[in-house]
Amino acid sequence: MKTTTEASWLKNSAFNFLVDYFASIPYRPYGTGATYENVVPFLKELQPGYVCVYAKGAPGYTTYPSSLKTQHLMLGQDMPKAFREFTRAADTKLVIYYSGLIDGIAGERHPDWRQWTIDGKPVGPSTGISNCIVNYSICPLSPYWEEWVSIQLREIIENYDPDGIWVDADWVGPCYCPRCQARLRADTGWKEPWADIKNRPDFQAEYAKSWNRITHGWRTQFNNFVKSLKPDCVYSAGNMSARREFAAPFDWRSGDFFTPHLFDLNDIARMMRWYGTMEAPYDAYVCDTNFAMTRPEVRSRTKTLDRILQQAAVVAANGGAVGYWTFPFGNGALVPSRMRKAIATRKFIQAREDLFIGSSSAAWTAILISDPACGVFGGPAGEGAHKALAGLHRSPDIIDETGVTDAMPYDLLVLPEQAFLDPQTAARLEKYVRAGGLLLSAGASLNSPELRKMLGVKNVRFGDLADGHVLLKTSDEPTGVDSLWDRVELEGDAEELYPLYLSWDQFNTEVLRNLHNNYPLHGQVDEEHPEPAGCPAAITRKLGKGRIVHLCTGIFSRYRSLGDPQMLGWLREVLDMLQPRTRCRTDAPSWVDLSLRRAADGRLLAHFVNHNPGRGMVKPIFYSLKNGRVEHQQVKWRQ
């Protein structure tokens, strides 16, 4: 059976529309305001590729009468039925939102379906942003599929004939229940007691891989069932791993990367660039509301149009379709002021569609995520590498090991600290470098014996120093990285590129015991008389026609959390040395993102997008603004 569907309307859709209307408040009528007169005129003006509406949200209440008796307690109308009528009247597609592995009602009725913690206890309920919302994370290996999800999916598809299904909440977990423990044992052959297994040094990495396989099986089962009921119904699950080994079920890639709560604009750009290597259509929902999940004292308010357009530009500049994500009025009616912003966003995208529909990456720099245990978003090292390379205007693609081929077009590959690099990929990397390619690696990537051999590293003592400094060649300001540094011993024609220097008073035990890391007089290098650490901070080796540079610390993971301009300065100097002539160079500030792409007609496009976050009042991390002033976010498009 064919498990994916080619849908031209997905590829040609530049703008989609999500109505975020949880059926979660049991003492308020649900859906009475979503009338033909309120909804259809807006849909006709917006002309979205599809409209996504809820059938079931995380609390488990359905927006239609289900045989499982899960419908909203004050359901005003059958919402999928209403929106099936509305979308047909507006000549657009209907996509159904369905909460996958979070279901409050299922967890209440079937406690044995709930996920377990690593300590062997069922995961408790989460109340989210309301005392009346109860969510439970559900184990994908439980009877939840057979006795719950498959029943509701059949109801949805047979009764409402949707054009697509968008699944949320498959990102929860991992689950450590006996079912999932048994799967881990089957995958690894481990036979020790659970108490011993979870203390193994390789437990976290192996469990991550096993859990990825479990959830991949869940998504495959989900999509196969959808296709068995309606072969042309497209499927996606939001915010899932973009590794190719898990790509098969997806008809399109998608995510709800809402800012400023969990995601920055850089995060949206990163996932669009990763999705862009997957040969499937992709979109991202940008929310018109400051969704204050982490700060219950802050009232959610509508964003300015400038901010919404800025987010939309990040998606569009990287080849994605823009999903406008709106919250309706409490009774389900679309809010006129928000719809005016939606229409303005639609016009903004429509005026530029030829610049990104059918476009592709210029493919000149790529970040390689080779560790199969990495997180959904690339892990700290992958995320930090993108943050740094985007700040240096490298417009990086993100690939996994399957993207390392003889035909890959990249001038430069960056291997951020990766705990695992398989020998076959390492061999392809060596072939790439010998043919003239450039490779920058860092930190734990030296776990690979093949990479050590390529670099000419004879011995390595991992994590030998907890702090270190580099004196730059083009700046009088040193770069300090308070992360573990590896002490490497070189052989052959490998060269030290930068020596490592110690912090002043680095081994004073009383200082280490009493001073917090943020104390201003802590972790300084003596710039006039720096103390050598006796080992390199960075090494290099020419290999065939190409060159490898390795940074002996986990700089990308550290840059992800800190974003130090000194770290970025060192990375800029290293890249300028490694690649003195590059395809594109700009003196734009680091917060101006460059996306270098090819239009469908072959034109080379350089999109410049302002990534300045503005004043994100609901973000747990506050931003420093120049002169304390919020400036309008503008996007500039250049051919």
Language-model segments: what does each one mean?
Residues 2-6, 11-13, 42, 83-86, ...:
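Carbohydrate-binding surfaces of carbohydrate-active enzymes
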